[in-house]
Amino acid sequence: MNTQVINQVKQYVTQRAIFIVLILLVIGIAIADPNFLAFSTLRDILQQSSTRAIIALGAAFILVTGGVDLSAGRVVGLTAVVSASMLQIDEYANRFFPDLPHLWVGFPIIIGIVAGLIVGLVNGIIVAKLHVPPFIATLGTMVAVYGLNSIYFDTEPNQSQPIGGLRSDFTVIGSGYIDLGGGYSIPYIVLIAIAVALICWVVFNKTRLGKNMYAIGGNIQAAHVSGIHVARNLIALYAIAGALYGLGGVLEAARTGGATNNYGNMYELDAIAACVVGGVSTAGGIGTVPGVMAGVLIFGVINYGLTFIGVSPYWQLIIKGLIIVAAVAFDIRKYMAKK
């Protein structure tokens, strides 16, 4: 009986480990500085984590299939630049397009999302039709997209000046909020991230595409045998991921009020790390939307919280690296135990 209880406790802790870690992180930082629990601090963490969450959700679609997408960060940079270049105020001295008429704010946003979707389609076709390993395929598109973005931006790599002077009807999406009264508010960008997460949850759990995604990641040969059109599903999943990266890039430009062709650098690694820490298996076939969101929040708490209490950025990198290694090791251990 005692053994059964112990096993049940172990299973409970294992299944909820990511949320336990998040709670412990918040408690630990709050002990070091009680001001960390102020509502404004938690709101800032959520606001800064929102775009990362959308990008991580895109990466999760690919990881669950057993693949990996290294192009995410550069797609974010491309879509941030494209949308920002079309949404500068008319009076700004250094307008990217001096003669561009005043556009409806939604048009460049749609253009950015579609640009991301197109890159995702290209990734999907290369992986599904040409049978190039996802790591190599997306590494190639990562470099190509950065080159394309630099050509569009018309500058040498690593020598860019930000596109500034963005219109307020665009930046309000990233920095505006709904006032709840009493000193409380919810940023628009947080609500957008929650809406995207809910849609992704539906796709993961309530659609044929989601079921096929798990089947492909669990055993691609078995998926073929069971009649799943693997290539078609992979292309669709990569396209969805690209669209999410595109949305993330647009929102990041709105949040920060500018963009350069170096935007999004290393975002793909942060997204993959958040997914893995959130329980998405590197072997494929396993992963949940709540887990991904928790993984993003863990890194949000680490980035903001450790800076809040004065921890060196270099120590923050070490801590993040150790968390990633521990998460992957734990994932591999579970995978080997099942085998």
Please give the residue ranges for each predicted region.
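Cytosolic-side transmembrane-helix boundaries in multi-pass membrane proteins
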Residues: 1-25, 225-232, 302-339
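Transmembrane alpha-helical segments in multi-pass inner-membrane proteins
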Residues: 238-239, 245-246, 255-321
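Transmembrane helix-bundle core of multi-pass membrane transporters
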Residues: 135-206, 233-236, 256-264
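Helix-loop-helix "hairpin" substructures at the membrane interface of multi-pass membrane proteins
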Residues: 104-112, 118-123, 181-259
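Membrane-interfacial amphipathic/re-entrant helices at transmembrane-helix boundaries
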Residues: 1-56, 91-107
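Alpha-helical transmembrane segments within multi-pass membrane transporters and channels
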Residues: 91-142, 294
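Short loop segments and helix-boundary regions at transmembrane helix junctions
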Residues: 6-10, 63-68, 118-165, 203-208, ...
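Single transmembrane alpha-helix segments in multi-pass membrane proteins
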Residues: 28-32, 37-91, 125-131, 279-289, ...
